[in-house]
């Protein structure tokens, strides 16, 4: 299925980026229990194949049967049926992590700090609450519209891979080619540590803009109940 292909792409891109040393913003953390340094993401599974993902059971089918599916069909009459396609293999990996983003104005330059990028615009909205992770595409679309831009004006997108269908929706709704979206893998491969994912994605985007000598990027995340937040950044 298409969702499984998105998941495999995320895994392979993340593995390649890790092996090539693209995740340069990772700060190693010492693990005293195992007496070792953790210096790379441990969720990446490049060995997975289509046959592995095909064996996994849909995770939300039981929840849908409790009445959630019926509510969706009532609220969205154009839907004829709901197909549960998300499994543990094409959903965000559970992970522990932390992220740090230093924000400031021009006065920081007096502290010997060199800015890497600046935020040009930001948008937060709540879309249809029943479409839980639809906010990512909606927030990005509004951000671009408000700035008089189209997706063609943006060099790279780092959009929250909260379930593979989110990536499919973003590509379709925003007309983004796979060559500009989550180019080093997303949270399906790298993990989704609550409260840290946004900062990690922003760091990944800036790193890749620098590596490719590109200028503009959009980073966006989804939240529950259709919430979405998007940032437009420019490399300095």
Predicted regions and their residues:
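Phosphate/pyrophosphate-binding loops at sites that engage ATP/ADP/AMP, CoA/4′-phosphopantetheine
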Residues: 109-113, 141-156, 174-177
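Short glycine/threonine-rich loop-to-helix capping motif typified by GTGT followed
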Residues: 36-39, 43-44, 129-136, 161-179, ...
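Conserved beta-strand-centric core segments of catalytic alpha/beta enzyme folds
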Residues: 79-83, 87-106, 198-236
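Residue-level signal for alpha-helix termini/capping positions
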Residues: 19, 145-148, 210-211
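N-terminal extracellular/periplasmic Venus flytrap/periplasmic-binding protein-like
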Residues: 2-110, 173, 178-180
């Amino acid at each position: 299925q298409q969702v499984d292909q998105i998941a495999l792409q995320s895994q392979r891109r993340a593995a390649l980026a890790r092996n090539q040393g693209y995740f340069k913003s990772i700060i190693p953390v010492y693990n005293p229990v195992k007496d070792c340094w953790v210096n790379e993401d441990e969720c990446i599974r490049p060995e997975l194949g289509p046959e592995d993902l095909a064996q996994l059971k849909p995770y939300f089918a039981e929840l849908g049967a409790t009445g959630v599916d019926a509510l969706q069909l009532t609220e969205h009459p154009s839907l004829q049926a709901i197909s549960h396609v998300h499994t543990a293999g094409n959903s965000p990996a559970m992970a522990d992590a932390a992220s740090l983003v230093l924000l400031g104005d021009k006065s920081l330059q007096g502290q010997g700090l060199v800015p890497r990028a600046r935020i040009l615009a930001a948008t937060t909205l709540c879309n249809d609450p029943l479409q839980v992770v639809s906010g990512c595409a909606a927030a990005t679309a509004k951000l671009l519209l408000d700035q008089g831009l189209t997706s063609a004006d943006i060099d790279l997108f780092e959009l929250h891979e909260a379930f593979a269908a989110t990536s499919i929706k973003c590509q379709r709704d925003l007309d983004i080619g796979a060559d500009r979206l989550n180019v080093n893998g997303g949270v399906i491969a790298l993990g989704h540590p609550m409260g840290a994912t946004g900062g990690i994605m922003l760091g990944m985007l800036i790193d890749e803009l620098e590596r490719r000598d590109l200028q503009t990027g959009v980073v966006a995340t989804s939240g529950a109940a259709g919430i979405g937040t998007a940032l437009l950044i420019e490399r300095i």
